[in-house]
Amino acid sequence: MARQSGYSAAHETRPRPLFSPDHHAFREQVRRFCEREIAPQHAAWEEAHGVPRDVWRQAGDHGLLCCWLPEALGGPGADLLFDFIVSEELGRIGATGPGFPLHSIIVAPYLAAHGRPELQQALLPAMVRGDKIAAIAMTEPGTGSDVAAIRTQARREGEHYVLTGQKTFITNGHNADLVVVACKTDPAQGAHGVSLLVVERDMPGFTRGRNLRKIGQHAQDTAELFFDQVRVPASHLLGDEGQGFKYLMQKLAQERLLISVQCQARAEAVLDWTVAYVQERRAFRQRLADFQNTRFKLAQLAADIAAGRAFCDQLIAQHLAGGLDAVGAAAGKLWHSELLGRVTDECLQLFGGYGYMAEYPIARAYADARIERIYAGTSEIMKEIVARDLLDR
């Protein structure tokens, strides 16, 4: 059974004042692309553990990549809402494989904000076209969420940095043509010694390990990366040396907001699939939808999802106005990742044994959802951030 793409739900008809008529027209364009080019192929990509590169170029041809990027940097000059629409529409069909949001919303901003003009012109227009795929590499074996403890080092030698180290769990890692790498240029300085370097595919000494096998999100390319004395031009340093940790923290709210957006959209989709299923499936001579237990569960989930939508749109509005801080982003990431986990668990239960079968979208959604409470900061870290703000005022 392929992932379902039908979509007729109450949350689709509720007004969302954030979005203009141009946004709505773009959403229809993205929806058609997702239903035509992604939904029918996604199961095959999960079997292959990756998305073909030509899909990225198709996305670029349809204007789905780096929508927010200014025209001066090779982008269409729209706003970030267009990129969030792409994320929502991928979530709507349960497509976790295409790494477009990370490429557009997480990686591209580092290049736009801190890249040298020559580097920007060489890479950003190609990212918009889908000719170059981007990744960011922070996580290392043994460091988890502690960026200040990374061991990958870069030593300055003339007009180059010599980069040595290892990264793991890197989304888009196998397909990536460029990787923003967090490394230590001054290990003695801790967090103040972290810098960001852009490593390109063809640089000698840059290799990729295995495409990591995960319990979910199988179509998403996740890799180990190795840097063995890679000579990176000094012009590929983003911003100033030793400022990498600060740059990462500045962009973290946007990364966590993206996870809220994706989780909310996927929770809505899972509820839609389940509402359709319980109206068709019969047990004990009646529809599942006629059992009070089913109706009560769906009602509670619908209420939780409606609250999540209001919260998510509030966070987006705050971010667009420049007012989303680390605490708000952490609270959102905590709420929406936990919401998705709860929704997929409750809905899978209503599917019964069929929900445990991998060919059903609900089973894949259940496995796909688990990582959301881990990456970009675990739920425990999100709680700590929010609690500190409450208790240390």
Positions of predicted regions on the chain:
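Conserved hydrophobic/aromatic beta-strand scaffold that supports enzyme active sites
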Residues: 135, 149-153, 160, 178-182, ...
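Flexible, small-/acidic-enriched active-site or ligand-binding loops
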Residues: 149-151, 202-233
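Alpha-helical interface subdomain recognition
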Residues: 1-93, 97-99, 114-119, 126-131, ...
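A short core secondary-structure module
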Residues: 159-160, 164-208
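A short, Trp-centered hydrophobic/proline-enriched beta-strand micro-motif
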Residues: 130-138
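Helix-loop "lid/cap" segments that line or gate small-molecule binding pockets
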Residues: 105-114
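Short glycine/proline-enriched turns and hinge-like loops at secondary-structure junctions
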Residues: 78-79, 146-148, 172-176, 190-193, ...
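Short Gly/Pro-enriched turn/cap motifs at secondary-structure boundaries
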Residues: 100, 127, 142-145, 169-172, ...
